[in-house]
């Protein structure tokens, strides 16, 4: 099996900002969980309230590892990566520089996913915490975040496609 080499680039500035925002949102989720537990408003949902930030922190850690070691993963274990078809269409030209830039831009989407995971973590923590007092979950807020994330991912992939196919 031939080793695929790409020209390595650092993350885009926007991706770095999205990573910081996502990590801050997860930190806020932890702070909210501790707040709801310290106010002692929740008796039976203590475990669920701590599991939400813990699970989202674990997923964020995995995403950060994939983003950090993206080139190593692609070069040594390409079968582990599920890249969008746009990457392979760009790669038809065999231009390593162009392919490396596109590969790097694809991981901006991973940074965006990290940010939306942080937002969902906050919403779930708020939902569980406020549900103990008012019994009104935030169901519609989940749908809005998921819809915005789907549209955002589509728009970023479209931007990548237009940039490299023109």
Model-derived features with residue positions:
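Cytosolic juxtamembrane helix at the C-terminal end of the final transmembrane segment
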Residues: 153-166
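Loop-to-transmembrane boundary segments
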Residues: 12-18, 92-115
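Juxtamembrane inter-helical linkers in multi-pass membrane proteins
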Residues: 74-96
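Hydrophobic alpha-helical membrane-embedded segments
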Residues: 52-75, 150-154
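Alpha-helical transmembrane segments, especially those used as permease/efflux helices
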Residues: 55, 59-60, 104, 112, ...
């Amino acid at each position: 099996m031939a080793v695929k080499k790409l020209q390595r680039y650092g993350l885009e500035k926007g991706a770095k900002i999205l990573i910081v925002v996502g990590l801050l949102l997860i930190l806020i989720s932890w702070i909210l969980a501790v707040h709801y537990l310290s106010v002692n408003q929740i008796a039976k949902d203590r475990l669920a309230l701590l599991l939400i930030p813990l699970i989202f922190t674990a997923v964020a850690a995995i995403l950060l590892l994939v983003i950090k070691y993206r080139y190593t993963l692609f070069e040594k274990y390409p079968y582990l990566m599920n890249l969008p078809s746009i990457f392979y269409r760009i790669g038809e030209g065999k231009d390593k520089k162009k392919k490396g830039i596109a590969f790097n831009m694809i991981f901006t989407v991973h940074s965006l996913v990290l940010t939306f995971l942080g937002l969902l973590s906050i919403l779930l923590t708020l939902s569980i915490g406020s549900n103990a007092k008012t019994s009104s979950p935030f169901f519609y807020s989940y749908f809005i975040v998921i819809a915005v994330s789907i549209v955002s991912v589509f728009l970023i992939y479209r931007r990548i496609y237009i940039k490299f196919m023109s």
